[in-house]
Structures are given as structure tokens and as C-alpha cells.
């Protein structure tokens, strides 16, 4: 029955893709991600200017992630039938306001308030991203549109820290956030001009968010999402000590490795739509299986710099399929409740990132250098098995 509802929901979709709106959404996402990670490269001048320690200043990143998790969970309950066009415009305005509040912050409290505004926009936008995408393009084009959005994310992740560091040294950290506010204004203008009216959820489709987990294969899917992202952060959070101590990379070498990873991630995201068109389930099971094998290879032969560098590239290519693949799964199998499913997905990912990094750090401190790799590889292997055995993918109509 649920599959029939999803089929009807997709049948009512758009006939032609609205690429201007898709790129507007992608630009907003890229700006949100860039601003989220700007403090990483500006912590020292921010801390000095505000008279706080770098550790305290780092909480400006933590509070954004914390607020984003709750925003993603409850945004669809709050906005209900409100036109999603106005909600996206509001998120773009919040992005701009956040940048200005941080730029003019004269206290740690105002800094946190500005970053909390960013968290509201970030979590809400991510929760709605899959449902927005499937309402802007025909069903057959959804994987391609999602790859555009996640491609923008990859670019933002690659350029955010180095761009912030470079500009901060020239114009100062406050003007970096002023420049980000200008990007926020551009987001508002682009969204206003390109995004069509997107009515909220009709009353007959209202359903408790967590009742979605009772649908066949959905709980398994969320568990697989948790394990794949926890596995990613269990390893990637500690890539610096692993690569510098295991493979013997210096700082410059590690920078090149991370740049290669970022480029590979962008390439993988760009081509993900072609893989997902052929088989979503194969991508969702095959990518973590390849990552599990990569972790094993790094454990056995990671002392070789060539092998370690190659694994970073393979990792970037393979993991790029994971976020696009799971968003595609939502648009296929939970099309009638895509917003609520997206809310749960984002909250699960935020929790997985936190747990993966925490457990990976504990393993590194107590069980040695290879333990985050072993943990990551084990989680990725379990993900592949759960997807293959339990996750259901609704065929594209």
C-alpha cells in the first residue's frame, strides 16, 4: 500500500526539470556548508578578538551542529502546510543574518546566537533537500539533480577552510563573514527569482514522523545510514594521525592527500547519478563494501605512501555515492513522506557523525593507531550486509 502511495505522489510531479531552481538550492547549500566550516580556519583571530580561548571559540562549530540536529527533526512539524518557497527564502535570510551577527559580535554570547541561527537554517534546509529536489524535476532526473546539490557540497567542503584562511589573512575574519553575508543576499535573490510555489503537506498525508520507521525496510535503512556515516567519521576524523604516523606523510603531503580526497569526492558525486540510475541498491551496498576493503588494505599495506594515497582517492570516490544514494532512496521509497524521512535522515547522520568521531577517538587513544580503521571497516561491512538483506528500494516509475 505504501508503495502505491509513493507511486501516486511521483505521478503528480513536474513534467520538466527546473534547473534554475535546482542550482539555486545547490548554491544555498554550498553557502550554508561554507559558512558552517569558516570558523575552523579562523579560530585563532576570532578567539583573540573576542578574548576567549581557541577551544571555546571552537564551540561556535559545535553549537551549529547541535541546533541543526534539532532543527532537522522538528522543522516539518512546525512549518506544516506553509509554502516551502517561503521557508527556503527564510533559511537564506537566516544565513545572511547569521553572518552579520557573527561579523558584528562583540561577545561570545552574540557569536553563539549567530551560529545558532545558521544551525536552524542548515538543519531545516538539509531535512527538506530531498523533497525539494523531487518537486523540481521529474522522477527520472532526481538522481542527477541530487548529484548537482551534493556536488556543491563537495566543492564547499574543499574550499571552505583554505578560502577562509586565505581571505582572513587579507581582510580580517569579520570581513570574511561580511563577504559570506553577501553570498547570503545572492541566495535570497536567486531563490526568490527561480523557486516556484511549493505548497506544504496536504492534510490527508499528515503522518507521525517516527511511524515511518514501521514501514518495511525503513528502520533497516536508517540503521545502515547510521553505520555508514559513523564508519566514515570514525576514520576520517583521525586521518591526520593515521596518515602521518602510519604512512609517514608530512604536513604538505597530508594536504595533498586531503586535496586529492576532496577532488575525488567531487568527481564521485558528479558521476553518482549514472551509477544510481542503474541500481540504487547496488550503489548503497557496493560503496560501503568497497570502503571496508579499502580499510583492510590500509591496515595491511598502509605504510606504503602510494597505497595510502590511492586509498584516500578510492575512499573519496566511493563514499560520494553514500549521501546521494540515501537521498535517492528516500525520493524512491518514501516519496509520499519525503520531508519527514529527510528530517529523520539528517538527525541520524548528525548523531552518527558525533558517535563515530567519539568512539573512533576512544579507540585511537586506547587500542592504537589502526583501531579507527578497523572500526570503520567493520561498520562499512555491516552496512553492506544490512542493505543487501533488509533495505527495500522502490523501482523508478
UniProtKB/Swiss-Prot annotation:
The keyword Transmembrane helix applies. Residues 43-54, 107, 169-175, 237-255, 303-305, 365-366 are periplasmic. It is a multi-pass membrane protein. Signal peptide: none annotated. It holds the Pfam family MFS_1. It is found in: Cell inner membrane. It catalyses: inosine(in) + H(+)(out) = inosine(out) + H(+)(in); guanosine(in) + H(+)(out) = guanosine(out) + H(+)(in). Keywords: Antiport, Cell inner membrane, Cell membrane, Membrane, Transmembrane, Transmembrane helix, Transport. Disulfide bonds: none annotated. The chain crosses the membrane at residues 22-42, 55-75, 86-106, 108-128, 148-168, 176-196, 216-236, 256-276, 282-302, 306-326, 344-364, 367-387. One of its GO terms (biological process) is transmembrane transport. GO terms for molecular function: antiporter activity; purine nucleoside transmembrane transporter activity; transmembrane transporter activity. It comes from the Bacteria. The keyword Protease does not apply. CDD domains: MFS_NepI_like. Residues 1-21, 76-85, 129-147, 197-215, 277-281, 327-343, 388-397 are cytoplasmic. GO terms for cellular component: plasma membrane. Involved in the efflux of purine ribonucleosides, such as inosine and guanosine. Belongs to the major facilitator superfamily. DHA1 family. NepI (TC 2.A.1.2.26) subfamily. This is Purine ribonucleoside efflux pump NepI. It comes from Salmonella typhimurium (strain LT2 / SGSC1412 / ATCC 700720). The gene is nepI.
Amino acid at each position: 500500500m505504501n508503495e502505491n502511495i509513493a507511486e501516486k505522489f511521483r505521478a503528480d510531479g513536474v513534467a520538466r526539470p527546473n534547473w534554475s531552481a535546482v542550482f539555486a538550492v545547490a548554491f544555498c547549500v554550498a553557502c550554508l556548508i561554507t559558512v558552517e566550516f569558516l570558523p575552523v580556519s579562523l579560530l585563532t583571530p576570532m578567539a583573540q578578538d573576542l578574548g576567549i580561548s581557541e577551544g571555546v571559540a571552537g564551540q561556535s562549530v559545535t553549537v551549529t551542529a547541535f541546533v541543526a540536529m534539532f532543527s532537522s527533526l522538528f522543522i516539518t512539524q512546525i512549518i506544516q502546510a506553509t509554502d516551502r518557497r517561503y521557508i527556503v527564502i527564510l533559511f537564506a535570510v537566516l544565513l545572511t543574518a547569521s553572518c552579520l551577527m557573527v561579523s558584528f559580535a562583540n561577545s561570545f554570547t552574540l557569536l553563539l546566537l549567530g551560529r545558532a541561527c545558521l544551525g536552524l537554517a542548515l538543519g531545516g534546509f538539509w531535512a527538506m533537500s530531498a523533497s525539494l529536489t523531487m518537486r523540481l524535476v521529474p522522477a527520472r532526473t532526481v538522481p542527477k539533480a541530487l548529484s548537482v546539490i551534493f556536488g556543491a557540497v563537495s566543492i564547499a567542503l574543499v574550499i571552505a577552510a583554505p578560502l577562509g584562511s586565505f581571505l582572513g589573512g587579507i581582510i580580517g575574519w569579520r570581513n570574511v563573514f561580511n563577504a559570506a553575508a553577501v553570498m547570503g543576499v545572492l541566495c535570497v535573490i536567486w531563490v526568490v527569482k527561480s523557486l516556484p510555489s511549493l505548497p506544504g503537506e496536504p492534510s490527508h498525508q499528515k503522518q507521525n514522523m517516527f511511524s515511518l520507521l514501521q514501514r518495511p525496510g525503513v528502520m533497516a535503512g536508517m540503521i545502515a545510514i547510521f553505520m555508514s556515516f559513523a564508519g566514515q567519521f570514525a576514520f576520517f576524523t583521525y586521518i591526520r594521525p593515521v596518515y602521518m604516523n602510519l604512512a609517514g606523510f608530512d604536513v604538505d603531503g597530508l594536504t595533498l592527500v586531503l586535496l586529492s580526497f576532496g577532488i575525488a569526492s567531487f568527481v564521485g558525486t558528479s558521476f553518482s547519478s549514472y551509477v544510481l540510475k542503474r541500481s540504487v541498491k547496488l550503489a548503497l551496498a557496493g560503496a560501503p563494501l568497497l570502503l571496508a576493503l579499502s580499510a583492510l588494505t590500509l591496515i595491511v599495506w598502509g605504510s606504503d605512501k602510494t597505497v595510502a594515497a590511492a586509498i584516500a582517492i578510492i575512499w573519496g570516490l566511493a563514499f560520494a555515492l553514500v549521501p546521494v544514494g540515501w537521498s535517492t532512496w528516500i525520493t524512491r521509497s518514501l516519496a509520499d513522506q519525503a520531508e519527514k524521512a529527510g528530517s529523520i535522515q539528517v538527525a541520524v547522520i548528525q548523531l552518527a557523525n558525533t558517535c563515530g568521531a567519539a568512539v573512533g577517538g576512544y579507540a585511537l587513544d586506547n587500542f592504537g593507531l589502526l583501531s579507527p580503521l578497523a572500526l570503520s571497516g567493520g561498520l562499512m561491512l555491516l552496512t553492506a550486509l544490512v542493505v543487501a538483506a533488509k533495505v527495500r528500494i522502490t523501482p523508478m516509475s
